[in-house]
Structure formats: C-alpha cells, structure tokens
Amino acid sequence: MATKKTSLTKHPLKILFVSSEVEGFAKTGGLADVAKSLPAALKKMGHDVRIVMPFYQTINGKDNAVAILSTELLVESQPFAVSYQVMQLDEGNVPVYALDAPQYYDRPELYAENNQAYADNGERFTFLSAASLDLCEKLGFQPDVIHCNDWHTGLIPFLLKTRYAESDFFAKSKSVITIHNAVFKGVFNYDQYSLIPELIQRRYINAEMDPSHISMLKAGVAYADKVNAVSPNYASELLTHLGSHGMEADFQNRAKDLYGIINGCDYDDWNPETDVYIKQKFKANKVSLARGKKACRRDLQKQVNLPEVDVPVYGMVCRLTEQKGLHYLIPVLEDFLLNDVQVVIVGTGDPTLASALRDISEQHSDKFAFVETYSNPLAHCVEAGVDFFMMPSEFEPCGLNQMYSLAYGTLPIVRSVGGLKDTVIDYDQTPQVATGFIYDTPTPEALLIKLQRSLLLYCQRPQEFKRLQQNAMACKFNWDESAEQYLDMYLGGEQSLVNEICNDKVDA
C-alpha cells in the first residue's frame, strides 16, 4: 500500500470532482458529505475545482440553476446521440455542473423506488462518466486531476485510457478513484453499456457474476492512476477477501497505488458551541460540559418519551441494516436493559430489524425508545443528549457518527473496523488518552461486554469518565487536513499524478 509523501505545489491544479450525489443538492449517504466538503477545502487552498453530478428531478436549488450548455453526447459506431444540458448550480465558490438528461434523471428518487433499484442504473451512470468528460471538452475545462467516487463514476478512468488515449485535450489528465464502500460494485449486463461500447471488448467481469455482466468499480480500480479509500484501515481491509467483498485481487494488483485518507468532519454543522438544534450549547470545560449534557439529556428524554432520570443514556442513529450491526445489538439489548440505563435508537430500514426493535420498545418503554424515522434535528439532539454512542458495525469504511460523538463529548463504542479503528482510542488499551471503547469480535457477546465496561466506567469512575469526555472533545478531524493529504496523493510518491503538469507550469 502506498505511503504518504508530503509534496507541495505553488501552482494551482484544475480538479474535476465527479459524484453521484452532493450534500445540499442530493444526498442518500456520506458520499454526499465528502462531495461537498473536500472540493470546498481544495478550493480554499487555491485550486480550481469543479463538481459534476446528475440533475435529478428532486435536486435542491433547481429553481436557481442556469443552463450553460445544451449539447449532445455522440458515441462513435452508435446510431444515436443523447441530448443533455449542463446546469450550473449555486454552491459558494465551487461551481457545480449538473447533467440534465431527463431520460436518466427525471425520477422521484436517486437510485431506487420502493427498495427496488432502477433497472437501467448501469446506463444512467455510464452516461454520467461519459458526459463528464464530454462537457470538459465543450466547456474548455482541461483538468489536471479527475477525482472519481465509487462505482457510479468508475468508467471515467477507463475512458481516459481507451477512448481518450490519443486526445490532446486530456493528454495530461490523471484520474483518482475514491472507494467509499466496496460492497457496491456497479455490476450490470452488457446491454447497459451501449454508450461505452469499448468496455465490452475489455470484459472487466466480476468473476462471481454471470459472464454477461461487467463491474464498473472493477474497471475504475483497474484503470485509475491512483486508488484511495476513505480511511487508512479501510485501505488495508480492501486487500483482504472479507474487507473487499471479493475484490481483493483487484486491490492487491493496485497496492502500490492504494492510499487511505480519513474523511473530515463538518464542524460548521456538528459543533456543540453553535448547534441550533440542541437545548443548551456547551463547551469542553467541565462546568459547561456537565450542564450542557444534562440539559440536552433532559430534552432528548422528553422528545422520545423516556423518564427524565439521571441514568447513563446510550444512543444510535443509523440505517437499520446488518452493516450497522443491529443483528449484534438486538440479541443482547434486553439483557443490557436490566441495568439502570436508557437506550435511544433512531433510524429506518430493514423491516425485520425494525419489528424486533419495536417489540423491545413496547416491553421496555421506560428504558428504550425506538424512533422509526430520520430527522436531522433529532440526530443532533441524540449526539448531544446521550453519554455513549453505539456503532457495532459489520464494516464501516470511514464513519461519521463517531466523529460527531467525539465533538459532543459522547463516547463512541465501536467495532475495530474501517475508519472506526482510525478515529477512536480504546479505554481498555490506553486509558490516559482514550476517547471511547473498541472491541474486535463480531458477536453479540463481545458487544455486551463493552457495553458493561462502559457502564462500569460511568458509574464507578465518574471523574475518569469526564476526563474521557474532554479527551473526545479535543479530537479534531478537519477537512483542511484531509484535503492536504489528498493533494499529497495527487502530487506525491514516486509516480506523481501531476508532476509533469507542475513542471510544465514552472517552465512556463
């Protein structure tokens, strides 16, 4: 796996950042947060950054969008063209180009309706890859780096090395693909790739699938100049069968070009000193922290109809999926509720998991609240109002909630996977600098042991607990630092992505 080598440039880079979703416009998960925050941080460093995304029917800000290009995507050897417009959206200093192609994006949701993925998702996001490069030529934006994200953009590196291999316009353009979640590989039948007929001859086939299927993610990993994961530990996990979900050979082939960079946290949104959603703002000093947490606990208890008593409160805000480890928590939750504690879980998802949580909440309504919805204000109130935040994840490429928890003096209880391992310091290993609790074994019993350990700390060592809260609030994961590491990846290492670009600019 590649090691980070600091390398700076005084010459601004032109960076095209392509994502299927961007916070503020369209969002289903953490990818959107990265697609907003990382380009903004790179722009702040002086680089010329442009974002490309689809112009969804439900996109926010569409009323203020301005059409800056009306054109067609022409495909050599194909008897058709796809008409589209480039709509510029207002997002501060970073231009956002949204691809308006109604046949692909004029739908009620981004990827699926009623838990059923759109049947033509392969073609929809093949278009995103092809049109992103097409618009660069037509707008005259000649990128030094094209930063791709997950399978939705995985065909851009392929196109650069095939269709545009002899292009003067893209001659010095290099590509990066960031892996936010390798479980989603973008596997579709050949008939969805008519916009990129070159792909069919290359046959980047998922070996576990029918031979008539191609994986966009595999193509992206194979052809990108650099590959990175959203945490150092997740980068290591991608080299294993379990961590890569069967793509270990693909990542092992790119090990020398594989980087791990932790996501930043948006402290403009998640800051107990300024949070508009919580009952009482607070700082890290002991008096402010104690008063603020107590007021926020009382407010949370009111909101979820739990008794307003002084007991440790445990929280969880997540999609109800096995990835988030609910199948480890549910079997031991009732045992844990025998203690003098309260638990709050907020989320929607798997009907079976939701039903199990509803049953437990009905039987233990004085100790357990299950809120089967998602509300951003309530999520803030949970982070501020609970004492411990549970993340018993099956896998977690980076994770954001543990960072939010640390900012609010809420101690995370996490499994030692992905970015959770990179961002939380375990009390049982290094108590002086600890910020939470970590465990390894993916079993309900191992989780219960850590829950009981955290309860002992709270009840028997209150001063130690308060010290850990202050340790947690001192942790910072700033996007500026993450952006510096991304720039180092663009510029650093023996095979710098853009060293020849910088040299050309120096010569000029």
UniProtKB/Swiss-Prot annotation:
Q: Would the keyword tRNA-binding be found if you checked this record's keyword annotation?
A: no
GO CC list: cytosol
Question: Which family is annotated?
Answer: Belongs to the glycosyltransferase 1 family. Bacterial/plant glycogen synthase subfamily.
User: Does this UniProt record's set of keywords contain Transferase?
Assistant: yes
Identify the pathway: Glycan biosynthesis; glycogen biosynthesis
What are the protein's UniProt keywords? Glycogen biosynthesis, Glycosyltransferase, Transferase
- State which Enzyme Commission number(s) the record gives: 2.4.1.21
What processes does the entry annotate via GO biological process terms? Answer: glycogen biosynthetic process
The entry's protein name is Glycogen synthase
User: Which residues bind ADP-alpha-D-glucose per the record?
Assistant: K27
The source's domain of life comes to Bacteria
Matching entries from InterPro entries are given as: Glyco_trans_1 (IPR001296), GS/SS (IPR011835), Starch_synth_cat_dom (IPR013534)
Could you give a GO molecular-function term held by this entry?
alpha-1,4-glucan glucosyltransferase (ADP-glucose donor) activity
- Coiled-coil annotated residue ranges, if any: none
